[in-house]
């Protein structure tokens, strides 16, 4: 923290295995702070923290916070959590995750990446290009960056790249020197109350940029474009495929595993310069759009065209963002298994469009809706999100702590998908049933795309082996 050394005592993270909490904990540990935490279950994140020397306790009990100096929580942690109760009883400061992240950001100049979708991938791309440019930023991301093997890293420079989560409004604490907004959709209305308040929060986020900074805004997205006139006294750099964009993508051409494109940069004197032949090893037009945001940041920070090209060529992607997790050899070819975090209709459409770009056979979507309230609020959009899938399997809703809502379930979603003209949409009850069904029906060249923010990732991880076993036993 600014003006304070690292000898402040132990900092305890409640729910340290959460992807947002773990990154802050890891960076603070690497900075020399004494860090520990607790979580409700073992996970690969917990295992990774322990391997880096951070003490993690399973189970949340009052005694876990004995003798600590500060307790850090996320908004998911309730005030009746036994560790929080014990901290308050003992007058131990309890701070939110965003407040701690904001303290870290005060130590450095920051690129803060916000938006309803695409934050994690865009944050990773920005970090990749700054690495390529020799800037060596500290990074705190909302997903595992494959080249780091972690979602966080302590860099040597005065720059930090962070994912700014808008879900609970806490991103307004994060004052970025450079701010990126990828898109704005009506999500997290339980917190904001209305979409108008969501949009107002993004305007405030942009206006928190200092006068010497800039905001990189995706002009292709209508809601982002609509807030540009409301930003009156901060410099705005637009990006996208629009002819009006300051950083424009053109000539997008599919290549194996990704896309090649040209970035056309509008200079301050009105002239243009082109960065041609950028190869992004990640499929999907939406990912080219994310890459343009990273180009805008990199150019602002003086990274050369050649280093931008080289940085993208080495981009290793993000865990659970169109990640290949398996392959099944079926004699005449192979079936590819993809794991993706997409759990909102906009994300699902983008992921399936990316799959359609490179698949030789069929696209088979396996979706696990995440939260009953999200499915209720976006049922129509979910039912229309699967046009690029030849076959759809819907798993039971992952509740994420919510209670069921009558009439809001995967069966209702599947009925709506079929009512809209889809010829092959089905329910599946579990990973074993899915493996049996796929073993009997997959064809060479098919791509199975598992979608969701719940435990569908575990299905994806074991699916290739399960299909192979079923086929061997047939």
Swiss-Prot record:
Places the protein is found: Cytoplasm
Superkingdom of origin: Bacteria
Pathway: Cell wall biogenesis; peptidoglycan biosynthesis
SUPFAM superfamilies listed in its UniProt record: MurCD N-terminal domain, MurD-like peptide ligases, catalytic domain, MurD-like peptide ligases, peptide-binding domain
Protein task: Cell wall formation.
NCBIfam families xref list: murC
Record-given protein name: UDP-N-acetylmuramate--L-alanine ligase
Organism in which the protein naturally occurs: Novosphingobium aromaticivorans (strain ATCC 700278 / DSM 12444 / CCUG 56034 / CIP 105152 / NBRC 16084 / F199)
Name of the coding gene: murC
């Amino acid at each position: 923290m600014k003006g304070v050394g690292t000898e402040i005592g132990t900092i305890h993270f409640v729910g340290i295995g959460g992807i947002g909490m773990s990154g802050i904990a890891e960076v603070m540990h690497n900075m020399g702070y004494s860090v520990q935490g607790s979580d409700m279950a073992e996970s690969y994140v917990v295992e990774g923290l322990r391997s880096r020397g951070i003490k993690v306790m399973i189970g949340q009990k009052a005694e876990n916070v004995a003798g600590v100096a500060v307790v850090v929580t996320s908004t998911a942690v309730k005030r009746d959590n036994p560790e929080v109760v014990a901290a308050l009883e003992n007058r131990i400061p309890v701070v939110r995750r965003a407040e701690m992240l904001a303290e870290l950001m005060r130590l450095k100049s920051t690129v803060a990446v916000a938006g309803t979708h695409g934050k994690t991938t865009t944050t990773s791309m920005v970090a990749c290009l700054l690495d390529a440019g020799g800037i060596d930023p500290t990074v705190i991301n909302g997903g595992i960056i494959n080249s780091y093997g972690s979602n966080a890293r302590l860099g040597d420079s005065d720059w930090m790249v962070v994912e700014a989560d808008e879900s609970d409004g806490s991103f307004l604490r994060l004052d970025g020197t450079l701010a990126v907004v990828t898109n704005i959709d009506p999500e997290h209305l339980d917190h904001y109350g209305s979409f108008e308040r969501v949009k107002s929060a993004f305007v405030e986020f942009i206006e928190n940029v200092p006068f010497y900074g800039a905001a990189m805004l995706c002009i292709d997205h209508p809601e982002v474009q609509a807030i540009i006139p409301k930003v009156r006294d901060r410099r705005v750099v637009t990006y996208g495929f629009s002819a009006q964009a300051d950083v424009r993508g053109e000539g997008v051409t599919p290549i194996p595993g990704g896309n090649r494109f040209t970035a056309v940069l509008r200079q301050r004197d009105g002239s243009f310069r082109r960065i041609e032949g950028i190869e992004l090893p990640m499929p999907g037009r939406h990912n080219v759009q994310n890459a343009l945001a990273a180009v805008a940041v990199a150019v602002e920070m003086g990274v050369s065209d050649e280093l931008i090209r080289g940085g993208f060529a080495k981009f290793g992607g993000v865990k659970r963002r169109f990640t290949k997790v398996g392959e099944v050899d079926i004699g005449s070819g192979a079936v590819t298994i993809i794991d993706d975090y997409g759990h909102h209709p906009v994300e699902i459409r983008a992921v399936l469009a990316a799959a359609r770009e490179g698949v030789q056979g069929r696209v088979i979507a396996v979706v696990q809706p995440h939260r009953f309230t999200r499915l209720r609020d976006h049922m129509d959009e979910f039912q229309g999100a699967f046009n690029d899938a030849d076959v759809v399997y819907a798993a039971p809703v992952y509740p994420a702590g919510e209670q069921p809502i009558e009439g809001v379930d995967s069966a209702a979603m599947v009925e709506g998908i079929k009512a809209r003209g889809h010829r092959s949409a089905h329910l599946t009850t579990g990973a074993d049933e899915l493996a049996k069904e796929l073993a009997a029906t997959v064809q060479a060249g098919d791509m199975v795309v598992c979608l969701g923010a719940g435990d569908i990732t575990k299905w994806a991880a074991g699916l290739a082996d399960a299909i192979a076993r079923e086929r061997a036993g047939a």
